[in-house]
């Protein structure tokens, strides 16, 4: 057991999907995994281990924001030996070419958080995805016919930002979307020498406000990213 995860050693696979919403973790376990067993209910942050196409895979919620995913990802890596971590979540488009329900693979993650600067105040340490996972995910998504964008994202510390226009301005510099977790996940992956990737479904748009989705859609649909994430985890 770790501080925030109730699993015993051996109950969590070395490959895991990380949705922010614990109910999305439950949805993935019930709809994609065979023989799924719940290994964690602490703080209602549900985690499950099962099999996908014969491969042992886990899925667990992380909550919202970089502090929350940092806690769970670190414990999964350090206490349970997880080697491949793929975030599957939602993001808001910052780019007019990126539309609702399309996929974004975060090649890198800029951030306005001090989560990295606290450790490296003298450097702008880049948060980047595992190239191996990124390459596999891109080709899997294209093979499945999914509209997929690859590029930089913004991992924001603030959801209700007072600097809304600044976020939109980043879209003009090629930033695809804004979300709240990828930079922290990539930073931990660099620190502990594991592989990480963030796959997001666009749930709304900061530049096309007429594009939107409901809370129920965000919880129970967006299955494309789940399929890509699972296929990427088991790809040789």
From Swiss-Prot:
Domain of life where this protein originates: Bacteria
Biological-process GO terms, alphabetical: purine nucleoside catabolic process
Record site: Important for catalytic activity: 218
UniProt binding sites for a purine D-ribonucleoside: 4, 179-181, 203-204
GO cellular component, one term: cytosol
Pfam families tied to this protein: PNP_UDP_1
UniProt GO MF annotations: purine-nucleoside phosphorylase activity
Protein residues bound to phosphate: 20, 24, 43, 87-90
Family: Belongs to the PNP/UDP phosphorylase family.
Record protein name field: Purine nucleoside phosphorylase DeoD-type
Classification lineage: Bacteria, Bacillati, Bacillota, Bacilli, Lactobacillales
Gene this chain is encoded by: deoD
